[in-house]
Amino acid sequence: MKKIRILGISAFFHDSAVSLIEDGKIVYASQEERFSRIKHDQAFPQKSLRDLLSYNKIELNQIDYVVFFEKPFLKFERLVETYLAFAPRGIKQFLSAMPIWLKEKLFMKKEIIDQLKKIDHNFDEKKLNFSEHHFSHASSAFFPSPFKNAIIFTADGVGEWATTSVAIGDNNKIKIKKEINFPNSLGLLYSAFTYYIGFKVNSGEYKLMGLAPFGKPIYSRLIKDNLIDIKSDGSFRPVSYTHLR
């Protein structure tokens, strides 16, 4: 019986990586930095993808589906709408950033296809799929788990729009039930503290996490009173954004 193979790709953000699923089982996963020796390498994972194919003794055309971890067009929409919401503030940065966004977000599908065709110039473009960011997080948590049914909680900086989500996992299906959207993000607040104490955003958060047990929560009340508004239902919004309106 023919195996169903799914190639997962994460790239162009931080810690680019690939994984291979065969008949529902993860048989390979690696980060590009292991091959490029560039910490948190965000480039398309060419080297790790080639190793994936070599290790599993398969060709790219033997893969049934290729899935990218987010939907770039929706992220591009958020970037544009966010700048327009605060216009004319930041117009110079907006105009200088637009060419980069057009290349990295709006035309990312073409970039991914071009990269895959470097390995196999006959790559079938119809095999390429895009999953919403939080759906990818939920899937990576639920499907490898021992549970047939579960509530799935996801919280990060931001995906396309969602920063926090709750989903229901039921056998082979996942349904997002509730989302909190950008700019309301505990993850971005955490990144702000990461930057404040001198670490790099999207890199040093784990260091802050490692330091946390050695400290005392003497500023927790100050943070709750001045930086974030926590509602009775558990939802939240940063109070510090209001002065930008």
Task: Please provide the spans of the model-predicted regions.
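Short glycine-rich, Thr/Ser-proximal phosphate-binding strand/loop in the N-terminal lobe
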Residues: 12-41, 174-180
